[in-house]
């Protein structure tokens, strides 16, 4: 039976479902449709004419058949927002999946909203201390900025992100929203228990659309998480939005794009790649009311940073943290590349003269070592001048001092985690490049927090 607001399914191809409505009651693009028989939500993507709309399913289409009644809700997908969402795990539709009962929030907001206008936005120059030495020194984060964690498979994107959430929740007691976009379910589960054990779960709202979910879920779960973060921001808070992984958001778009009948573009990506990325990224911004600081893990296919997906993401970021396989192979964790990682905040007017000089000094020393590596490989250390030998020794100490034991990795390493303040970080590296610790062995600098710990460790070596 078809009423004015209901239609029927006429074609189902994978995650894409075509629905026919009466000509005078065709749903708008992004309207949510409800299939009561399968308890499935569809989102309108295209109007094909003759009353037919093409939709993406926000769930599995198994068991769906033609001629089933579909109801138009006449509004986009809406999700619960506010403090009631903290400590809870939700799916793309804002439904709880942690078996702890319903989320009784006072307000629901649509996941499709316009980005704040130019007048509402505010610039960000205040620094956010993370307690991770290499980040605070060489690619400092701004409150209200966007940060990308770039890395191939298995170099530690998720572990770095978990450490950042833990440090910021405990040291800055801020609210965070975590959107798991197409990542491993095991990681999502580990993450939940990690937050629980660190007693920061009551400050984090979790939204998951994992690898095993249909592409519709993975395509929209980022927007669900973003909507939660926007609500906290509009209450006047400084909120953190973690997205793991932004590449899977692109990938879900690829999966759906062909089914929607679009021609693929470069490397088989969807032709609307830049527009889809922009729609998400432009909403992640700080307004005069509050700020959203976003940290996004970016998987780099085959370690190729020129691939269209990471390349499109680069354009939106204030800071890029590049994880390197070569550094991970040397056993230095976090495996952040100190010469490849960048930040717009690395400016003497923002971070101060001393911090800037130390950061540039560290990079100069490491760069000199990189240049000398070929000579060392062919002729050995003995052929270098005294100045170059000293630079190499200091660079090797700096490399090791950039490593640090993480709180979230205690279970793997057995070493207690360390949070290092920005002052301690600057002081330590300043001492190394000024030659104050030239007599200490390299090994003393490996996997310690502050410089005092390195001095203590040297005594026992």
UniProtKB/Swiss-Prot annotation:
Lineage: superkingdom: Bacteria
Cellular localization per UniProt: Cell inner membrane
Reaction equations catalysed: ATP + H2O + 4 H(+)(in) = ADP + phosphate + 5 H(+)(out)
Pfam family, one: ATP-synt_VA_C
Predominant subcellular localization, coarse grouping: membrane
EC class (word): translocase
Positions of ATP binding: 151-158
Membrane topology of this protein: Peripheral membrane protein
InterPro entries referenced in this protein's UniProt entry, alphabetically: AAA+_ATPase, ATP-synt_VA_C, ATP_synth_F1_bsu, ATPase_a/bsu_AS, ATPase_alpha/beta_chains, ATPase_F1/V1/A1_a/bsu_N, ATPase_F1/V1/A1_a/bsu_N_sf, ATPase_F1/V1/A1_a/bsu_nucl-bd
Protein family membership: Belongs to the ATPase alpha/beta chains family.
The protein's assembly and partners: F-type ATPases have 2 components, CF(1) - the catalytic core - and CF(0) - the membrane proton channel. CF(1) has five subunits: alpha(3), beta(3), gamma(1), delta(1), epsilon(1). CF(0) has three main subunits: a(1), b(2) and c(9-12). The alpha and beta chains form an alternating ring which encloses part of the gamma chain. CF(1) is attached to CF(0) by a central stalk formed by the gamma and epsilon chains, while a peripheral stalk is formed by the delta and b chains.
Protein name: ATP synthase subunit beta
Organism: Coxiella burnetii (strain RSA 493 / Nine Mile phase I)
């Amino acid at each position: 039976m078809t009423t004015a607001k209901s239609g029927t399914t006429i074609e189902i191809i994978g995650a894409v479902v075509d629905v026919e409505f009466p000509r005078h009651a065709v749903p708008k693009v992004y309207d949510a449709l409800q299939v009561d028989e399968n308890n499935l939500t569809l989102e309108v993507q295209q109007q094909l004419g003759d009353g037919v709309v093409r939709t993406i399913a926000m769930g599995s289409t198994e068991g769906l058949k033609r001629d089933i009644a579909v109801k138009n809700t006449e509004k986009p997908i809406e999700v619960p927002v506010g403090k009631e969402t903290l400590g809870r795990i939700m799916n793309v539709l804002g439904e709880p999946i942690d078996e702890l009962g319903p989320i009784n929030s006072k307000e629901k907001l649509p996941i499709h909203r316009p980005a704040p206008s130019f007048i509402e936005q505010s610039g960000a120059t205040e620094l956010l201390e993370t307690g991770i030495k290499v980040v605070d020194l060489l690619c400092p984060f701004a409150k209200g900025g966007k940060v990308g964690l770039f890395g191939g498979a298995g170099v530690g994107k998720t572990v770095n992100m978990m450490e950042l959430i833990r440090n910021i929740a405990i040291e800055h007691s801020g609210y965070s929203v975590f959107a798991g976009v197409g990542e491993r379910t095991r990681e999502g589960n580990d993450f939940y228990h990690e937050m629980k054990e660190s007693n920061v779960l009551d400050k984090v709202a979790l939204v998951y659309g994992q690898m095993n979910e249909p592409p519709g879920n993975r395509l929209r779960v980022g927007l669900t998480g973003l909507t939660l973060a926007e609500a906290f921001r509009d209450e006047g808070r400084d909120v953190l939005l973690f997205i793991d992984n932004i590449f899977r958001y692109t990938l879900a778009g690829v999966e759906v794009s062909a089914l929607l009948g679009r021609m693929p573009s470069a490397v088989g990506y969807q032709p609307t790649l830049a527009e889809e990325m922009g729609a998400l990224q432009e909403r992640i911004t700080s307004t005069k009311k509050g700020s959203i600081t976003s940290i996004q893990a970016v998987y780099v296919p085959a370690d190729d940073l020129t691939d269209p997906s990471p390349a499109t993401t680069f354009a939106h970021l204030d800071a890029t943290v590049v994880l390197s396989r070569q550094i991970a192979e040397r056993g230095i964790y976090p495996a952040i590349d100190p010469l490849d990682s960048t930040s717009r905040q690395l400016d003497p007017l923002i971070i101060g003269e001393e911090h800037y000089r130390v950061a540039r000094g560290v990079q100069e020393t490491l760069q000199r070592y990189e240049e000398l590596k070929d000579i060392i490989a062919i002729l050995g250390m003995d052929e270098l001048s005294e100045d170059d030998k000293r630079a190499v020794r200091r660079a090797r100490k700096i490399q090791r001092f950039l490593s640090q034991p993480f709180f979230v990795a205690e279970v793997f390493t057995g070493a207690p985690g360390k949070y290092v303040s920005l002052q301690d970080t600057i002081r330590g590296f300043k001492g190394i490049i000024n030659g104050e610790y030239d007599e200490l062995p390299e090994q003393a600098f490996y996997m310690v927090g502050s410089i005092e710990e390195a001095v203590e460790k040297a005594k026992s070596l």
